[in-house]
UniProtKB/Swiss-Prot annotation:
GO molecular function: structural constituent of ribosome
InterPro entries per the UniProt record, alphabetical: Ribosomal_bS16, Ribosomal_bS16_CS, Ribosomal_bS16_dom_sf
Pfam families on file: Ribosomal_S16
Organism of provenance: Clostridioides difficile (strain 630)
Alphabetical keyword list: Ribonucleoprotein, Ribosomal protein
UniProt-listed NCBIfam families: S16
RNA-binding recorded as keyword: no
Record's protein name: Small ribosomal subunit protein bS16
Length: 90
C-alpha cells in the first residue's frame, strides 16, 4: 500500500480549508484517510498552518511520501529539518 501525506479539501464553495492527512494513494482526494496530522487555512491572513510534528515524522519515517504542496508546508514549519536530523542521529 503506497501511502501519501496530502491535503483533503474542506470548507464551503470559494472558501477552501484543508486538512493534512495520511491516506492510501489510491483513495479519492476527499475520501477515506488513515490519520489527520494537521490543517492548512489559505484564506486567513496570515495563512494558518498547524502540523503535529511527531505524527508527521512518524509517517515520513515509515515511508509516506508528501505531495509537493504538503512538502512545502512541512519545510516551512521545519518538520523536514527535524526528520533529517532524526535520520542522522540513527
Amino acid at each position: 500500500m503506497a501511502v501519501k501525506i496530502r491535503l483533503k479539501r474542506m470548507g464551503a464553495n470559494k472558501k477552501p480549508f484543508y486538512r493534512i492527512v495520511v491516506a492510501d494513494s489510491r483513495a479519492p482526494r476527499d475520501g477515506k484517510f488513515i490519520e489527520e496530522i494537521g490543517y492548512y487555512n489559505p484564506i486567513s491572513e496570515p495563512k494558518q498552518v498547524r502540523i503535529n510534528d511527531e505524527k508527521a515524522i512518524k509517517w515520513l519515517a515509515t515511508g509516506a511520501q508528501p505531495t509537493e504542496v504538503v512538502k512545502k508546508l512541512l519545510v516551512k514549519n521545519g518538520v523536514i529539518e527535524k526528520f533529517e536530523a532524526s535520520k542522522q542521529a540513527k
